Structures are given as C-alpha cells and as structure tokens.
Curated annotation (Swiss-Prot):
<keyword id="KW-0934">Plastid</keyword>
<dbReference type="GO" id="GO:0009523">
    <property type="term" value="C:photosystem II"/>
</dbReference>
<keyword id="KW-0793">Thylakoid</keyword>
<keyword id="KW-0472">Membrane</keyword>
<keyword id="KW-0604">Photosystem II</keyword>
<comment type="function">
    <text>May be involved in the regulation of photosystem II.</text>
</comment>
<keyword id="KW-0602">Photosynthesis</keyword>
<protein>
    <recommendedName>
        <fullName>Putative oxygen-evolving enhancer protein 2</fullName>
    </recommendedName>
</protein>
<comment type="similarity">
    <text>Belongs to the PsbP family.</text>
</comment>
<keyword id="KW-0150">Chloroplast</keyword>
<dbReference type="GO" id="GO:0009535">
    <property type="term" value="C:chloroplast thylakoid membrane"/>
</dbReference>
<dbReference type="GO" id="GO:0015979">
    <property type="term" value="P:photosynthesis"/>
</dbReference>
Length: 11
C-alpha cells in the first residue's frame, strides 16, 4: 500500500 493512496492524492 502507498501512503499517497491513503491520502487520496490525485493521479
């Protein structure tokens, strides 16, 4: 899992 994914960062 990526921390950015938890933050909901735009891709």
């Amino acid at each position: 899992g990526e921390a950015a994914n938890v933050m909901g960062a735009p891709k």
